[in-house]
Amino acid sequence: MTEFVFPLTGVEKARLRAGLEAAFTIPIIDDVEDFVWEALFHYVKNIPLPDPITQGRTKQLFDAVASDGRGWSLKTLVSRNFTVGSSFEFVIQRANIFQKAAQLGFPEGLNSSSDIANLGAALIRHWNEKHQRDCIAQNVTDPPIVILLKNRLRKRLAYVEFAYPILQEADYRWRWSREGGFGLQGWKDEQVHLKWYPSGTQLFQVFQMPENAYYFELEWQKATLSNFVENVIRTLAE
């Protein structure tokens, strides 16, 4: 399995379910992702939500930051397979290590024919630079990552929260997914944890579903648009 998993408290589970049911009911929201998920997560953890209009949004790593030093990177994925041990992945960074080779400690340059260990080391350094830079900028000392997995109908979901430290170069072995340099894979503990494709410079991180993920089901129905708007206006007028 992957890194250490943090469980939700009973109160947080209740807030997660309530927040998701409320969000999916709203007819002007097409899905829970991006800022909608960020806002709901602030509700789950009971931390202040910055106003995206007056305070803006950033491309920094941590989408929610608490005053105690915790900072969460938040992801959502639509998944068909929620079984324990199943893999899921997402892009964490565009890593153009060929262009930044000297900056990453390879002054002689890098290309797809370079030593595979050097390519892997460059990828980890590229990611760690962003991780460490954003930790400092956002005052984060405890960095988890949270993934909300949803089935197609958004009725069956799973929540998992992993520790999210920087990567260690010595932990990984590297190999091409097939001859010709199509995709580079970073292996750790006999499993693929990183994937990188030179053509698009995208770096993916791969996780395995842990035994103690929080699985749950929701029952919700979209409100009609007119009822939703009228109820909001009525509530604001009270």
Task: Describe the role of every protein-language-model region.
Residues 1-60, 76-238:
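Nucleic-acid endonuclease domains
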Residues 58-71:
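Short acidic loop-to-beta-strand element that houses the catalytic metal-binding Asp/Glu
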